[in-house]
Design a protein with these regions (language model features):
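Glycine/threonine-rich flexible loop motifs
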Residues: 30-39
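Anionic-ligand anchoring segments at beta-strand to alpha-helix junctions in alpha/beta enzyme folds, i.e.
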Residues: 1-19
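Short acidic, glycine-rich surface-loop motifs adjacent to enzyme active sites
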Residues: 19-31
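A short helix->loop->beta-strand "cap" motif at the edges of active sites that frequently abuts
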Residues: 43-50
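Long, well-ordered, tryptophan-enriched scaffold segments
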Residues: 62-63, 67-183
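Generic recognition of flexible, low-complexity loop/linker segments
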Residues: 10-14, 40, 183
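Short, polar loop motifs at secondary-structure junctions
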Residues: 54-60
Length: 183
């Protein structure tokens, strides 16, 4: 995801080269002499991890990939959306991972016309909220002692409705316009 939006992992953290078993890389500019990807890919290849490169051309990193998927330039985002669509459709989403490491259970305000419609619901201290299934109430999303919901419509203390962000993602990307045939 970082490269798709123009970032680079050496600025924001890097893949777990020591434990990765399957590494999928999307269209990376290969113009950095000291690029740490080279070292990381060497570690992956030595350990026998699978390396898949998604890039319009099979040069550089793609040439050493275990599998190369050649796509049209500028369509990597569409491919990611089609993959999300298929994973959702096949019910192959690791919800435990999403709950622990992402904002999937964070509640999103559903109040058409309000200034904060579509924003994360927050408590008085500004902490994002989730719905705790065990207590049947809102709770700080980052609390470790809750059982967060990832689907459903819930009522916030102020009476407004909110849904987990994962539900919004699923509703959008399960639409057939994101199927592999459509994109």
């Amino acid at each position: 995801g970082l490269y798709t939006i123009g970032g680079s992992f050496w600025e924001f953290g890097e893949p777990d080269w020591e434990h990765t078993k399957y590494f999928m890389m999307f269209g990376v500019a290969e113009d950095h002499d000291s690029n740490p990807i080279k070292i990381g890919l060497g570690k992956l290849k030595t350990r026998g991890a699978k390396f898949v490169s998604i890039n319009p051309v099979k040069t550089g990193y793609s040439a050493i990939a275990d599998e190369w998927i050649g796509i049209r330039p500028g369509t990597d985002g569409l491919l990611v959306l089609a993959i999300i669509h298929e994973l959702l459709k096949a019910d192959q989403i690791d919800l435990d991972y999403l709950v622990r490491y992402t904002n999937a259970p964070w509640l999103v305000i559903q109040d058409e016309g309000a200034a904060d419609h579509g924003l994360f619901a927050r408590d008085a201290e500004g902490r994002p909220l989730s719905w705790n299934k065990a207590a049947n109430s809102v709770a700080p999303a980052l609390a470790t002692d809750i059982t967060p919901a990832v689907v459903g419509t819930f009522t916030l203390p102020d009476g407004r409705k909110a849904v987990p962000s994962f539900q919004l993602l699923a509703e959008r990307y399960l639409d057939e316009e994101y199927s592999p045939d459509a994109v």
